[in-house]
Amino acid sequence: MGEPEKNHPELASFGGDQLKLHAKIAEMMQTIIIPSGEFCCVAPMGTAIQNARTSTLGPITRDYYHLTKDVGRYIAGLTFFGALTGLDITNIKWAPEGVDEKQFAIAIESAANAIKTPFEVTPSKL
């Protein structure tokens, strides 16, 4: 298993294109969620995952719906933590068991870039 396929039923209305789906989510966040004033912050986990998909990381989902239990969840957690606390996640040195040095670097890069530009995918340098 691995990343969602173009014929995945949830992506059908977006032509099987994850980036189109991401753009629609970002648009809704900017036009509906944030202007509502009901939320303190945005945790752009979807953007972080899309950022990671531009890297050499490989699959980030385990069954087309759920993030991998190691690096996928770590990216989401880093993004949530950084967005919620405002702390600089590039200073984090810890990674869960099963996340190697390369995955760690990609996770930090992907999450930090998502926090910096939450509505735009940032191509990885890794």
Which residues does each predicted region cover?
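Long, charge-rich low-complexity segments
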Residues: 112-126
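Cell wall/extracellular polymer interaction/catalysis modules
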Residues: 1-2
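Catalytic His-Asp segment of secreted/periplasmic serine-dependent ester chemistry enzymes
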Residues: 5-115
